[in-house]
């Protein structure tokens, strides 16, 4: 073999080595690309299924019942949202006034600390475990605008703060009160939108009287429950809080209560267990006013099976009107920095009958609402029992005829 042939062989060998090396590098690059694409695909699949699951089975802080105004959804044993109707009795909790306005101490503390850190965890658990948890939304959600001229106290909160309710298990709020119109028609409109956007149901105010006087309905296989919200405060001819009419937005105003009684009778005739939540009474006193004493028997006679009240900012007496329990005022649930007794009513309804009613005593103090300990609970029960002629609270808060 001459030198030229040997050189040609070496050149061919180098070409083969270069080609082989190139093939290895190319294969390595392709493998790297495939691995990267595969990893990205896995990540995308994980994100996709996470989003899908969060939108369909992520547990909310409450159990949905079937309602004519909400999805036909309940939770399964694991807390996932599944289609269907709730079996068995319905549990409801009721508490008094709450305020999200950050210009006041209570609202500022909620904004800075988080609502779950200003209310006793055991009280939050009661609301989250209930099928329906209700508070009085004592303010409008409003951005911009002007408060009612000449009104001493006016409130408003950011629309985003309506999401607070979801964190503590509240799924229905009452709007028939003397502050929901503090920022006028625009403020009320913003309030309805904010609550709707947050998925929080509401009663007692609307774009017209039909909406304001509309009941909220909850159904299980054994129960049909109707809840109404109304107010009789600001009894003068020119109230700061506008009553809704056929053409004007406002609250369900019942200083003259014939339409409220009609609505109770209508709901009762449809086969509902009717609950009425009133904004009534005189502020800062445990004494009932004449309108409370007049209206409670009328509402009960019209067919209400349970009546609860707010507005006085303090606890008032409990009584039975016939077989209808009346909690005249539940006080402030989380409203200001003052120390005050308060509480929560827990009602269980089965086969359209009230199975049990329990008062859970609590104390609002230093911008925290705590469940009362045994000693404080005994004191609050004794205080209420002294005022309440026909009703008595037992040691566990269960309400009984005296």
Please annotate each region the language model reported.
Residues 2-7, 28-402:
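Acidic, metal/ion-coordinating pockets
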